Regions:
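Bacterial Sec-dependent N-terminal signal peptides
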Residues: 1-25
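Buried hydrophobic residues that stabilize the cores of well-folded domains
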Residues: 21-278
Length: 278
């Protein structure tokens, strides 16, 4: 059984980043990975999970980036070398996402496809409309309302028939580099909320997760904001390349004592990366 706090952190992050997101999330979710040196050209990532009593085969992911550090493709493979997920992104001026295609293999259903199309204003400074298709059929679309300085105020979301189904309202927390998105049904009933970075190329963290960084600026300890001494946490150890980017990351379940002292380390995940640069 997973410790309660670890399950809570994992569930929280999955909710924040999952595809069941507000429409604005298709634009605000990070499409890049930050390099501490030169811009990434490609990353080949292998991940192994270690759980007592379970044998889980490693997975491999290959990512490619443009010269601005934005992902152009991401392909995930199972242990047999078969593709299980594909993501392809297209940009204007290298930075403005205009199309994102995701193909995922789902058991008993086969390949499922999602396409996102983003329409920008004439200066490519802010999106005006987002349309999402699932398996070739229009699923939802959204039109955005901005203020005088081009900050999102709200979005009106429509279903495949053109009916208004949701309204998304935005609150900015500049000091934390965060936008909080509150979603309401067409009748005004609250439906949920999500959090995104204002600038995904700068550091940010979710409100409910507390992080301690190592001297290289990577997360070393991660726990819930209200955690106390003795609670469970995640602890990370890294190896780095000459650019300052990690090439091996080990994730441990740990107990925290006073002063963030780590005890009872249990290896949960090991990820290695082969990186090339522009």
């Amino acid at each position: 059984m997973f410790p309660r706090i670890l399950v809570t952190i994992s569930a929280f992050l999955l909710v924040q980043m999952s595809l069941a997101q507000p429409m604005v999330g298709y634009f605000l979710s990070p499409q890049s990975e930050l390099s501490k040196g030169r811009a990434f050209k490609s990353i080949e990532e292998t991940s192994e999970i270690f759980l007592k009593g379970l044998t889980i085969t490693p997975t491999r992911m290959e990512k490619k980036f443009n010269e601005f550090g934005n992902i152009t493709s991401s392909v995930t493979y199972n242990s047999a070398g078969g593709k299980t997920n594909e993501i392809y992104c297209e940009y204007v001026n290298g930075e403005n996402l205009v199309r994102k295609q995701t193909r995922s293999f789902v058991n008993h259903r086969g390949w499922q496809e999602e396409e996102v199309f983003i329409t920008w204003d004439d200066c490519y400074s802010i999106p005006q409309k987002i349309e999402v298709k699932k398996n070739g059929q229009i699923w939802q679309s959204a039109k955005f309302i901005t203020d005088s300085i081009l900050k999102f105020e709200s979005a009106e979301v429509f279903n495949s028939k053109g009916d208004h189904v949701f309204t998304e309202r935005f609150t900015y927390m500049e000091a934390s580099n965060i936008i909080k998105v509150m979603v309401f049904r067409a009748n005004g009933a609250f439906n949920g909320s999500s959090t995104y970075p204002i600038n995904h190329k700068e550091s940010f963290t979710f409100e409910s997760v507390k992080q301690t960084l190592n001297p290289n600026g990577d997360v070393m300890i991660e726990t819930l904001s209200h955690a106390v001494s003795g609670d469970q946490a995640y602890y990370y150890e890294y190896e780095y390349d000459s650019q300052g980017n990690w090439i091996e990351k080990n994730t441990f379940q740990v107990n925290l004592s006073r002063g963030n002292r780590v005890t009872k380390k249990k290896l949960e995940n090991k990820t290695t990366r082969k990186i090339t640069y522009h």
